[in-house]
Amino acid sequence: MSASLEPTPEQIEALAARPADQSVVMINLLQFRADRGRQSYLRYMQEVTPHLQRVGGTVRYAGESPAVVLGAGEKPWWDVIIVVEYPSPAAFLDMVTNEEYVKVHEHRAGGLDRGDLVATSIWTGAE
């Protein structure tokens, strides 16, 4: 399995150090494996739903990236972007460390060549 599909201990520590009373919005940039990667990831999406519900997570957006409108003009490396909001960093960590979730995660890891996950917060400057 690619190292980019699993967080480092330092990345987990950085997420856990975020404010506990603020939601965290995860930006998933996903590149599927050529052989049945999309199907494996779709199975993950179906099976992860109860785990998301248990911790209060919500999928806010899922979309494909067919073209760049502004920028270098090349097609992005990722196939799909999925945005998921969690009520807190602890909620996300609770989900991904759950024994039952770990079984479901196999479909995610098995379906991806690359899967970058960026933790973001609401930008108060935009309000």
Which residue ranges define each predicted feature?
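Short S/T/G/P-rich N-terminal loop/turn motif that feeds into the first structured element of a domain
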Residues: 1-80, 87-94, 121-127
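Short, Lys/Arg-rich amphipathic alpha-helical interaction segments
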Residues: 83, 90-127
